[in-house]
């Protein structure tokens, strides 16, 4: 299958996806917010006042959900890509495995973290068969 046909199929699938459409209505940056919402409904993770770190945060829908549900808590969103701010959260652009980024996290978290979350995907472009 040609790449152009694959791209068209992906676009058509996105247009039909109920979660993609609902994310636009609800103001989430991506459909993945509903995955976290489902997890939270089952396990009751997010409460007011929590300190939350979102690793691999871009485009930010998990951070949006955490900020909305953890309300008065602290949110740090970390990603290699620059991200638009979410409320009064802290955005750190960097690799969380690097010491410089870890120091920035420590500087902003005040020693205590209640939730560490990540929805990162493996970069398959680096895998060669």
Task: Name every feature range the model reports, one short phrase each.
Residues 49, 112-113:
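Local beta-strand N-terminus motif with an aromatic residue
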Residues 113-123:
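Short SAM/SAH-binding signature in class I
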Residues 74-79:
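Conserved SAM-binding motif I beta-strand of class I
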Residues 127-129:
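Conserved small/polar residues in nucleotide/adenosyl-binding loops
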Residues 59-70:
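Conserved SAM-binding loop of SAM-dependent methyltransferases across substrates and taxa
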Residues 81-112:
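S-adenosyl-L-methionine
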Residues 1-47:
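Class I SAM-dependent methyltransferase Rossmann-like catalytic core
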Residues 48-58:
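Conserved class I S-adenosyl-L-methionine
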């Amino acid at each position: 299958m040609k790449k152009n046909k694959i791209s068209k199929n992906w676009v058509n699938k996105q247009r039909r996806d109920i979660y993609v459409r609902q994310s636009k209505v609800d103001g989430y940056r991506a459909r993945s917010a509903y995955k976290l919402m489902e997890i939270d409904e089952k396990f009751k993770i997010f409460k007011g006042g929590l300190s939350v770190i979102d690793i691999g945060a871009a485009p930010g829908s998990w951070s949006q959900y955490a900020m909305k549900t953890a309300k008065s808590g602290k949110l740090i969103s970390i990603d290699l890509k620059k991200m638009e701010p979410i409320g009064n959260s802290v955005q750190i652009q960097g690799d969380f495995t690097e010491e410089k980024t870890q120091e920035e996290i420590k500087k902003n978290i005040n020693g205590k973290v209640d939730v560490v979350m990540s929805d990162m995907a493996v970069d398959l472009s680096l895998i060669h068969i």
